[in-house]
Amino acid sequence: MVTLSPAYLPSDGGTQAASAAPSVEENWVVQPSLTLLVLLLVPCVLLLFFLNCFLLFHRLPAFSLRKRASRRKVGQYPCVRVGHSGQARLEPPYMLSPGVVLREGRLGSDTISQGFEATLALEEGVCGRQNTPQSRGSCCQGGSIPSDQICCSPRPRCATPLPCCAPRRAWNAPAYVKKRLRPKVWKVREDELGSSCELDTRHNHVPPNTPAADNALGVTPKVKFCHTSSTQRKSHVGMVPFTLGGSELLEDPSVIPREDTAEHLDASSSLPGPGLDSDFGVSAGISLHILSSDSDSGSQSWTSGMEWDYYDPCYMRRNRLRRDARHNRHLPMMCSKQYWI
């Protein structure tokens, strides 16, 4: 095949010049080809691929060993060995006390929780008396464990605080471990108590059948009540402290101390009460106000600051008694006693 090129034609338009086609070698050298680029990129890609595979397979065993070691450290804890010098030192976590076998494949939640509990027990067992020489058998139960034996197990053997088990750095237990080791406080609900006898500790609001306590300190004693049928029985939990300016609750209503106050014969000197006592009912709540002369009625007693009325146990203050005594000086001095029936 012959191609004609206008460059080889003579200017005068005479003869035609035939030029031969260029060879394959000339086309190979002159024209750039994609084959050369592919041949250069393929070795580079293969080299990078083999290098990546080499690094991956080289680092894979290290990653697996590190992961296995981290799992193993979660279920184990450092052991403490105490020598004859009395100083505690940490041992490798793989050395356990005889009779304790932990399988490496057991990585459940129970093993992890046991490890955390034992580590927390070792942390809490630190005693401040590190300078005092103590034997190993004195801090463990029974004293049968030798002094150079390791003090660690999944369930700690030492029930008392261990002065010899001292960790090197503090460790904060997770929240769920602290919640599990927290002592349980049993709270008795009010509805669990029987309705026939309910123990209720409350502030002493003055019952209708006893005089109110005038406590100088402003603290009312606590009274324990036991409800039986329709009668409410009162008993003091503690003794009421003695106060000079105040008064005292009487333990027994029939026992009434002496008074040096003036009791008047007419009913106008006493304050009207609220009526019969609601605690004893209308039929049984009758109080007798017996007036009797007493030789020692003029004695200065600490109960002279109050006086009982006819029905209700309300009392009159000392200033009220003195004011009534000024108006009624002609009346005789009497001592009052009250009996409940």
Curated annotation (Swiss-Prot):
GO process terms (BP): dorsal/ventral pattern formation; embryonic axis specification; positive regulation of canonical Wnt signaling pathway
Membrane-topology descriptor: Single-pass membrane protein
Can you supply one Gene Ontology CC term for this chain's record?
plasma membrane
- Bilayer-crossing residues are 37-57
Q: What if the gene is knocked out? A: Morpholino knockdown of the protein results in embryos lacking the body axis and dorsal tissues. Reduced dorsal marker expression but enhanced ventral marker expression.
Entry's localization field: Cell membrane
Q: Does the keyword Transmembrane apply?
A: yes
Residues spanned by motif VPPNSP motif = 206-211
Q: Tell me the domain of life.
A: Eukaryota
Principal location listed in the UniProt entry: membrane
Topology: which residues are Cytoplasmic? 58-341
Q: Which residues lie on this side of the membrane: Extracellular?
A: 1-36
What keywords appear on the UniProt entry? Cell membrane, Developmental protein, Membrane, Transmembrane, Transmembrane helix
Q: Which family does it belong to?
A: Belongs to the huluwa family.
**Main role?**
Key maternal determinant of the dorsal organizer and body axis formation in vertebrates that acts by promoting stabilization of beta-catenin (ctnnb1). Localizes on the plasma membrane of the future dorsal blastomeres in early blastulas and binds to and promotes the tankyrase-mediated degradation of axin (axin1 and axin2). Axin degradation results in stabilization and nuclear translocation of beta-catenin (ctnnb1) for activating organizer-specific target gene expression.
Q: How does it assemble?
A: Interacts with axin1; leading to promote the tankyrase-mediated degradation of axin. Interacts with axin2; leading to promote the tankyrase-mediated degradation of axin.
Name recorded for this polypeptide: Protein huluwa
